[in-house]
Design a protein with these regions (language model features):
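A short helix->loop->beta-strand "cap" motif at the edges of active sites that frequently abuts
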Residues: 130-136
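Conserved SGNH/GDSL esterase-like catalytic core that processes O-acyl groups on lipids
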Residues: 22-27, 32-118, 145, 151-155
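Conserved beta-strand segments of alpha/beta enzyme cores
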Residues: 59-61, 135, 169-172
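Substrate-gating cap/lid alpha-helix
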Residues: 143-175
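Alpha/beta-hydrolase-fold catalytic nucleophile elbow
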Residues: 98, 139-140
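Bacterial Sec-dependent N-terminal signal peptides
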Residues: 1-21
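N-terminal cationic-hydrophobic initiation segments that often serve targeting/anchoring roles
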Residues: 51, 124-128
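Generic structural signal for well-ordered alpha-helices
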Residues: 84, 120-125, 157, 161
């Protein structure tokens, strides 16, 4: 009888522990994710707003890095930033990726555009290695205003669509 009670106690303890674990959401990206230039960034960036909307059953973390590029040969590759390493260790159940805007920079896109889809798929795969059960959501590019040096931004959504066609779910951050 003691064995049965002991085993039942252990089973119940594990059942309660698994219910208490929060669903982890990793928000990965550039300054849009980080919240650069937003007043009260810690509470107004989109990952903080998402946390508020999802509630206590979720743990949403901001792994944005201002100026980050998706391209590994870009001028500030996301995969070389500490935010990336932290995001991998977090091993989110959901990974929302919003990268590509800084890749439209003339220092990157003209030279490395052919690497975009490959680098995106590699990034997605790295998160799947960290948590094989994770669901990856790829955000569409936020619009680029016309008074910018990023004239090739209209080409990036095509790259994102190629990544999306390989199983991640697209997410629209536009109005």
């Amino acid at each position: 009888m003691r064995k049965i009670i002991g085993i039942l106690s252990i089973f119940l303890a594990f059942a309660f522990m698994s219910q208490a674990q929060k669903i982890k959401v990793a928000c990965v990206g550039n300054s849009v994710t980080y919240g650069y230039g937003i007043k009260n960034r810690e509470t107004n960036c989109y990952p903080a707003q998402l946390q508020q909307m999802l509630g206590d059953a979720y743990e949403v973390e901001n792994f944005g890095h201002s100026g980050a590029t998706l391209l590994n040969k870009g001028y500030r590759p996301y995969t070389q930033q500490e935010a990336y390493q932290k995001a991998l260790r977090f091993a989110g159940d959901y990974v929302i990726i919003h990268l590509g805007l800084n890749d439209t920079d003339p220092r990157a896109w003209p030279n490395y555009r052919d690497d975009f889809v490959r680098d995106y798929l590699s990034l997605i795969e790295s998160f799947r290695k960290a948590n094989p059960r994770c669901k990856v959501w790829v955000c569409r590019m936020t619009p680029v205003w016309t008074a910018t040096h990023r004239e090739k931004s209209n080409e990036i959504p095509l790259g994102n669509e190629n990544c999306v066609s390989r199983k991640p779910t697209p997410v629209h951050l536009e109005k």
